[in-house]
């Protein structure tokens, strides 16, 4: 949706929510190409995508969601009117796809992002792993509840980490776990020669324009491809479970069980650049998933470790995907 900024898409989403939510039982609104018969519709390269709990017949649907919608935006001091075609996406059962954790070792968390930072009192880099917040008990309180966390490695291997922080009101689903480089290598999660140069991260503005871009994820160390379906500026689909999440990518056209239980926290590469962290999937086939902006999660994690340790400027960076 290159024609509109991310802020404009938020405004459009909010306006259309107010207009249609009650009369059409709208679950959410995103932006992407129209799809017909499981293929992209060339007549609708850019659409307003209405998420509904159950699709109606075409005739009945048009009474509630018209083929096109009009809206107004202020540009250069003047109000302008725009019109876009619509698409309807039926929401099946939505599942948070992380494995719930217990501090007694009842589960293992999946992580897809490794970061490093330097604390002033240290001569070495500290390593951290980023995953989802919903893997941990809702009653969790920090710092008194910090404990050793078991993290899934390659095969049957496991390593321990210390939970440093979880997102709360940040409109994210994220947590940060401190780990040791030696343990990452011993658990076959990381190569001994792994470097610490910072890697590129896809921006929210780029995610906004990624409709139909190809993506790659590695749940359980197996490469799985997908295609970007929509960009959702403020995602309400999982509001009852974890609250609203900002800047969400909806992925589809993946193999069965790609986004199933236990795969939350997996990193998504979109157009060959790391762009999102998975937090949910659509049951029962789990061929569709939902990921949050890696850029926003990284900003939260950087601010968190700086508040905790007063890290050296520019030392926090994303260095590896796992």
Q: How does the language model describe each region?
A:
Residues 26, 45, 195-203, 278:
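A broad structural signal for short, well-ordered beta-strand segments within beta-sheet-rich domains
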Residues 260-264:
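Short, small/polar residue-rich loop motifs at catalytic or cofactor-binding pockets
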Residues 251, 269-322:
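C-terminal subregion of chymotrypsin/trypsin-like serine protease catalytic domains
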Residues 97-252, 256, 269-270:
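Serine endopeptidase catalytic core focused on the charge-relay Asp
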């Amino acid at each position: 949706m290159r024609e509109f900024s991310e802020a404009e898409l938020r405004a459009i989403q909010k306006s259309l929510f107010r207009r249609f939510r009650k009369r059409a039982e709208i679950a959410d609104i995103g932006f992407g190409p129209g799809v017909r018969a499981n293929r992209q519709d060339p007549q609708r390269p850019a659409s307003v995508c209405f998420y509904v709990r159950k699709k109606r017949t075409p005739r009945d649907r048009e009474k509630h969601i018209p083929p096109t919608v009009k809206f107004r935006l202020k540009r250069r001091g003047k109000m302008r009117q725009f019109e876009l075609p619509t698409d309807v996406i039926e929401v099946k059962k939505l599942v948070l796809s992380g494995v719930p954790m217990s501090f007694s070792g009842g589960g293992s968390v999946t992580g897809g992002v490794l970061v490093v930072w330097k604390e002033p009192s240290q001569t070495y880099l500290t390593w951290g792993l980023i995953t989802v917040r919903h893997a941990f008990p809702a009653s969790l309180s920090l710092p008194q509840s910090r404990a050793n966390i078991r993290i899934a490695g390659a095969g049957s291997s496991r390593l321990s980490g210390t939970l440093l922080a979880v997102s709360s009101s940040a409109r994210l689903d994220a947590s940060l776990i401190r780990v040791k480089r030696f343990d990452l290598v011993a658990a076959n999660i990381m190569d001994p020669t792994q470097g610490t140069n910072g890697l590129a991260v896809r921006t929210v503005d780029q995610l906004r324009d990624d409709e139909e871009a190809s993506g790659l994820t590695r749940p359980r160390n197996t490469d799985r491809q997908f295609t970007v379906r929509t960009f959702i500026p403020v995602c309400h689909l999982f509001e009852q479970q974890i609250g609203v999440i900002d800047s969400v990518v909806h992925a589809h056209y993946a193999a069965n069980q790609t986004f199933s239980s236990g795969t939350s926290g997996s990193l998504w590469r979109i157009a060959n650049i790391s762009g999102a962290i998975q937090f949910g999937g659509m049951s029962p086939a789990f061929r569709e998933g939902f990921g949050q902006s890696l850029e926003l999660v990284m900003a939260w994690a950087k601010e968190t470790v700086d508040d905790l340790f007063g890290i050296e400027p520019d030392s926090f960076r994303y260095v590896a995907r796992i």
